[in-house]
Regions:
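Glycosyltransferase specificity loop/lid
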Residues: 1-276, 280-482
């Protein structure tokens, strides 16, 4: 019996990191399993502790040409003094999982024709095994080309900073022009990992994965030419860069079979078209109690309808990733009387809501977002303009791209935050009114719809992303018969 042609995938620990892998695999298999070679995808999941119920639900719903294996869980004893920041922590979990991953790949090669290993950016250490098994090393880069461009440039920028005596990466007073990027950045808007001391574990972990990125065979990019074509082209022209394959947008097609039965979706059914501001900060992002209060007061004062997915606050903005958070009722942190005063104006949903269905709903008029790349792609493909309130990682770069170049977002004006970095209630009101009421908001909405149309064209037959996916499949197909 002829062996299946297999693609192995290694996401990072965490529910939010798994979704792009599942959606990419579904798209790839649907696109390419009618060309004489039948691909199969196996997802090998590194874990720390028991997988979440949401992770298990996603994996149990995989189609028949996909399967998964949980690698043995890494225990706290193995971690010794575990890093508190999620980036070095994820990197360490993957490193400790390498022996188990090697066993899993050995098993796959005995049963299938294994042609590629696809990792997350922060699972890139797993690609050390690709050469050992003589297969393609690939990174599924779930952020955009602008972020990728910075990641590829970062080792050189770091080297140029070797003469700095104060442990700072860059001159904080000057804008930064990253080679290949179509927009300049303030230093504060670059990924927050570079703002750690250069001697820190967080900085070193990020530098290590950026150095490894230039050595992989293929970077699969969740973007498309109409969105970031100039930057994609700049990377593709670099002789030292890996082969870049822009196949986006990759988004979830639905949040779950029960989504339309939820109260928040039923509530949307009773709201006027384009009237509701949706607020959510991603699967792992959190805001401080002070910022939560300012947003709440701003929403109330704006008078606009809102649907707010609320989690307990934290001073650590990335606290939802790999860190055990409190199980408090998030509604308890709202200002006194807020829910009663806004009963006819908005709805607050604790912890989770079906984002795809909300963004696709005709009543949703704008999205106050942390500017995580996946959430932004979901917003753009559904034609929903963004209010940018970035929290961490590359989100400030994304916010700059969306506001300054792509014009699909508005952001509280520079200087609108107070001395503690909090965007005040007055500024929340101001930016809500700009996007929901002004001519400026209408222009942003129009531009978002244009990019939505371009996104659908990119993934259609013979679109730019469709053709890029075909090119990738051909590489893997030829490997299977080599």
């Amino acid at each position: 019996m002829e062996k299946k042609v297999c693609i192995a995938m290694v996401p990072c620990p965490g529910h939010g990191h798994l979704i792009p892998f599942v959606e990419f695999a579904k798209r790839f298999l649907l696109h390419n399993n009618n060309n004489g070679v039948f691909f199969h995808v196996t997802i090998l999941v590194p874990t720390q502790g028991s997988p979440s119920s949401s992770t298990i639900a996603i994996l149990n719903a995989l189609p028949s040409n996909m399967d998964f294996t949980f690698l043995p869980s890494i225990t706290m004893d193995q971690l010794h003094n575990p890093p508190t920041h999620p980036i070095p922590r994820m990197k360490l979990i993957v490193q400790l999982s390498l022996p188990s991953l090697r066993k899993a790949l050995t098993s796959l090669t005995s049963r299938t024709t294994l042609v590629a290993l696809v990792s997350h950016f922060f699972s890139i250490d797993s690609l050390l095994l690709a050469q050992e098994f003589n297969i393609f090393s690939c990174v599924l880069y779930s952020a955009g080309a602008t972020s990728l461009c910075f990641s590829l440039s970062f080792p050189m920028l770091d080297k140029e900073s070797d003469n700095n005596s104060n442990d700072e990466f860059l001159d904080l007073t000057k804008p930064v022009k990253v080679s290949g990027c179509s927009v300049s950045f303030q230093v504060k808007d670059l990924p927050d990992l570079i703002h750690f001391p250069r001697s820190s574990e967080v900085y070193k972990s990020y530098l290590d994965v950026c150095k490894a990125l230039s050595l992989v065979d293929v970077v699969i990019l969740n973007s498309f030419n109409s969105l970031e074509g100039d930057t994609i082209g700049s990377i593709q022209k670099e002789k030292t860069a890996p082969f870049v394959c822009p196949i986006g947008p990759i988004i979830q097609t639905e949040s779950g079979n029960e989504a339309n039965k939820l109260e928040c979706v039923r509530w949307l059914e009773n709201q006027p078209p384009k009237s509701v501001l949706y607020i959510c900060f991603g699967s792992g992002g959190t805001i401080s109690h002070e910022q939560l209060n300012e947003i709440a007061h701003g929403l109330e004062l704006s008078g606009h309808r809102f649907l707010w997915v609320l989690r307990p606050p934290s001073k650590i903005s990335e606290s939802g990733y790999l860190i055990v958070t409190k199980n408090d009722d998030p509604l308890e942190y709202l200002p006194s009387g807020f829910l009663n005063r806004t009963k006819g104006q908005g709805l607050v949903v604790p912890s989770w809501a079906p984002q795809i269905e909300i963004l696709a709903h005709g009543s949703t008029g704008a999205f106050l977002s942390h500017c995580g790349w996946s959430s932004a792609m979901e917003s753009i493909i559904h034609g929903v303009p963004i209010i940018a309130l970035p929290l961490f990682a590359e989100q400030r770069m994304n916010a700059t791209l969306f506001t300054d170049l792509l014009k699909v977002a508005l952001r509280p004006e520079q200087g609108d935050a107070d001395e503690n970095g909090i965007v005040t209630r007055d500024q929340v009101v101001k930016v809500i009114k700009r996007i929901m009421e002004s001519d400026e908001g209408l222009e942003v909405r129009k531009r978002t719809r244009e990019l939505s149309d371009a996104a659908f064209l990119a993934i259609k037959h013979n679109g730019s992303s469709y053709m890029a996916l075909s090119s990738l499949a051909q590489k893997w197909r030829l490997k299977s018969i080599a």
